[in-house]
UniProtKB/Swiss-Prot annotation:
PROSITE patterns, A to Z: CARBOXYLESTERASE_B_1, CARBOXYLESTERASE_B_2
Organism for this UniProt entry: Diutina rugosa
Protein name, per record: Lipase 3
Subunit structure: Monomer and homodimer.
EC number: 3.1.1.3
Source organism phylogeny: Eukaryota, Fungi, Dikarya, Ascomycota, Saccharomycotina
Gene: LIP3
Superkingdom classification of source: Eukaryota
InterPro entries: AB_hydrolase_fold (IPR029058), CarbesteraseB (IPR002018), Carboxylesterase_B_AS (IPR019826), Carboxylesterase_B_CS (IPR019819), Type-B_Carboxylest/Lipase (IPR050309)
Disulfide cross-links: C75-C112, C283-C292
Keyword set includes Hydrolase: yes
Record GO biological process: cholesterol metabolic process; lipid catabolic process
């Protein structure tokens, strides 16, 4: 028995997977039986000290002979800061706050820029498998690859006969990754979190062949903030997605997120948050505020960050930290860049959940009257004229039967304004942004989806980020799209090669004849038209910059 156990352990050690990096270093990963994983590989120098808030610097140390068998730490996280806990019963609250996406992610460190590669068992260099590069979500405030396990997707790809390699890149969030303000603009350090992602893509281009991946077959995909990040990489450098003369990616998948409705790095709100952050960190009177911030402790910066509003605060989707036009890599407002055709021309999938706004509507339950709703919208959308606010409120009336969660009649109106505000927030940030993108993007084949899988769920409906449950943890009709169809798209640039029971139609415009959406519900898949809430679309998208934050 002891001999058999010893031989088993020897065989296990001998079976540990290896990969050779572009610089000649050989690293060892973890044999997880159903897959092989290389976890926590550094791709950038620690962004600490003088590198804090700055562009990432490629990692220059030797990794030869090292083992990468566990995830690296999460980047520093902001407290999402909810105000609704005492106002709402436990049913919906538990659903939101106990989900992995909204739980605190530990351990945390500023030294966090690592990348994870998971491949089918037995994959060797030369296999040239398609690569799916995941960008996690979390409102640009929280998140980590550790809460989005790729095992289900990689295993399904093997069962489908379309094996892929899954890569997940860590990136700085909150103040560490998306601090704005005049000082940041002057230094050219804006959007550091996006630059982390971009450097991770370059690492993949240089090294993935040594793991058995094909650097010419990379699909970038993400959810929520990750989805918006994918859009940012489509328009990065006015659409130039090349590195060393070759494209960094050949396709994109966006799950709940497109253009970020944001003012420039040196805009009014970015400076307001910067001033609050600097003051909270004790650097308000410093002659060189950034130098002061770079000398502060991590705990000091964490406290200062948590003193700014999170996405579950009253200000909700008026986020403190998010990608902003910087005049360098994101050269203009994102809607204009898409409208002007300044994007990488690649095939895309983009889709939404039917009730994207309900989570964010929970933070304004003290808004109960029509007058208070108007004041809330005026405070949230400082660029909108009185006439534009009037048009918005007419398109999204107080009538609870028209609000979100949609198609629920008089039910789920936990306040007279909850369903109304939820509808506006969900449509602005997700639903109508997706439709705007699809109506203007002409860079490649387009597919779109809309899920109503949880339409019977009280208060929340088919809420934002529920797709992660089906993508990473459970099976069901959603999983067929978020796994099988996405894998087929990454492999063949056509989701229909997954053998879907319903043909997924191509999307040309929201007014095209015939169906243009793949619809998901609890019973299965069907197709539909992207022609709902047109008055809301017109109110929000006729002049999108009026609703920038």
């Amino acid at each position: 028995m002891k001999l058999a156990l010893a031989l088993s352990l020897i065989a296990s050690v001998a079976a540990a997977p290896t990969a050779k990096l572009a610089n000649g270093d050989t690293i060892t990963g973890l044999n997880a039986i159903i897959n092989e994983a290389f976890l926590g590989i550094p791709f950038a120098e620690p962004p600490v000290g003088n590198l804090r808030f700055k562009d990432p610097v490629p990692y220059s140390g030797s990794l030869n002979g090292q083992k990468f068998t566990s995830y690296g730490p999460s980047c520093m996280q902001q407290n999402p800061e909810g105000t609704f806990e005492e106002n709402l019963g436990k049913t919906a609250l538990d659903l939101v706050m106990q989900s992995k996406v909204f739980q605190a992610v530990l351990p945390q460190s500023e030294d966090c820029l690592t990348i994870n590669v998971v491949r089918p068992p037995g994959t060797k260099a030369g296999a040239n498998l398609p690569v799916m590069l995941w960008i996690f979500g979390g409102g640009f405030e929280i998140g980590s690859p550790t809460i989005f396990p790729p095992a289900q997707m990689v295993t399904k790809s093997v069962l489908m006969g379309k094996p892929i390699i899954h890569v997940a890149v860590n990136y700085r969030v909150a103040s560490w990754g998306f601090l704005a303000g005049d000082d940041i603009k002057a230094e050219g350090s804006g959007n550091a979190g996006l630059k982390d992602q971009r450097l991770g893509m370059q690492w993949v281009a240089d090294n993935i062949a040594g793991f058995g991946g094909d650097p010419s077959k990379v699909t970038i995909f993400g959810e929520s903030a990750g989805s918006m990040s994918v859009l940012c990489h489509l328009i990065w450098n006015d659409g130039d997605n090349t590195y060393k003369g070759k494209p960094l990616f050949r396709a994109g998948i966006m799950q709940s997120g497109a253009m970020v409705p944001s003012d420039p790095v040196d805009g009014t709100y970015g400076n307001e948050i910067y001033d609050l952050f600097v003051s909270s960190a004790g650097c308000g009177s410093a002659s060189d505020k950034l130098a002061c911030l770079r000398s502060a402790s991590s705990d000091t910066l964490l406290d200062a960050t948590n003193n700014t509003p999170g996405f579950l605060a009253y200000s909700s989707l008026r986020l403190s930290y998010l990608p902003r036009p910087d005049g360098k890599n994101i050269t203009d407002d994102m809607y204009k860049l898409v409208r002007d055709g300044k994007y990488a021309s690649v095939p895309v999938i983009i889709g939404d959940q039917n009730d994207e706004g309900t989570i964010f509507g929970l933070s304004s339950l003290n808004v109960t009257t029509n007058a208070q709703a108007r004041a809330y919208f005026k405070q949230s959308f400082i660029h909108a004229s009185d006439a534009e606010i009037d048009t918005l409120m007419a398109a999204y009336p107080q009538d609870i039967t028209q609000g979100s969660p949609f198609d629920t009649g008089i039910f789920n109106a936990i306040t007279p304004q909850f369903k109304r505000i939820s509808a506006v927030l969900g449509d602005l940030a997700f639903i109508h942004a997706r439709r705007y993108f699809l109506n203007h993007f002409q860079g490649g084949t387009k597919y779109s989806f809309l899920s109503k899988q949880l339409s019977g769920l009280p208060i929340m409906g088919t809420f934002h980020a529920n797709d992660i449950v089906w993508q990473d943890y459970l099976l069901g009709s959603g999983s067929v799209i978020y796994n099988n169809a996405f894998i087929a798209f990454a492999t063949d640039l056509d989701p229909n090669t997954a053998g879907l029971l319903v043909n997924w139609p191509k999307y040309t415009s929201s007014s095209q004849s015939g169906n243009n959406l793949m619809m998901i519900n609890a019973l299965g898949l069907y197709t539909g038209k992207d022609n709902f809430r047109t008055a809301g679309y017109d109110a929000l998208m006729t002049n999108p910059s009026s609703f920038f934050v």
